[in-house]
Amino acid sequence: MSDEAKEKRELESQKESSHNKSEKSVEPKPKRRRRRNYDDYDAEVAKEETKAKNGLTKSENNGTVEDSESDMDDAKLDALMGNEGEEEEDDLAEIDTSNIITSGRRTRGKVIDYKKTAEELDKKEPSTDSKDDVGYGEKEEDEEDEEDEEDEEDDDFKEQ
């Protein structure tokens, strides 16, 4: 046991000495920061600017040639724009009107025959109404059936 304790103490002293060494090594070596030298870059930019200015004066002299080219480009662009308008009209002509749902209910793309679904619901849940309440309860049942159908549609949509 005493040997183990001595080894532990030796390790602790080594850790402390290494810790002190690392602190000492950091302090005497300050990091030197270098500044970037942009003088060369500034000279290049100045040269490019002078070339650009010289190019502008030359282009002013040759402006008539560039104007005719730009007119040709404008004519081409106008022709292209005219073609795009025709393409949009063609897209509208390609729409199949048989797929458009004209009913007022949103069905998320499903075509629902409400009469058939009402019959199916009646088969699943036979009505327990008495003959006395037939006239009074029909409207409420229709509303409930519609809500049930919508809930089932929502459930089907969530499952997909």
Curated annotation (Swiss-Prot):
Residues 1-160 are annotated as: Disordered. Residues 84-94, 139-160 have a biased composition (Acidic residues). The keyword Glycoprotein does not apply. Residues 87-108 are annotated as: Important for H2A.Z-H2B binding. InterPro entries: Histone_chaperone_domain_CHZ. It is found in: Nucleus. The modification Phosphoserine is found at residues 68, 70. The modification N-acetylserine is found at residue 2. Residues 56-65 have a biased composition (Polar residues). GO terms for cellular component: nucleus. Keywords: Acetylation, Chaperone, Nucleus, Phosphoprotein. Its main location: nucleus. It comes from the Eukaryota. Pfam families: CHZ. Residues 1-29, 110-138 have a biased composition (Basic and acidic residues). Forms a heterotrimer with H2A.Z-H2B, stabilizing the association of the histone dimer. Also, with a lower affinity, forms a heterotrimer with H2A-H2B. Forms a chaperone-bound H2A.Z-H2B complex that acts as a source for SWR1 complex-dependent H2A to H2A.Z histone replacement in chromatin. Belongs to the CHZ1 family. This is Histone H2A.Z-specific chaperone CHZ1.
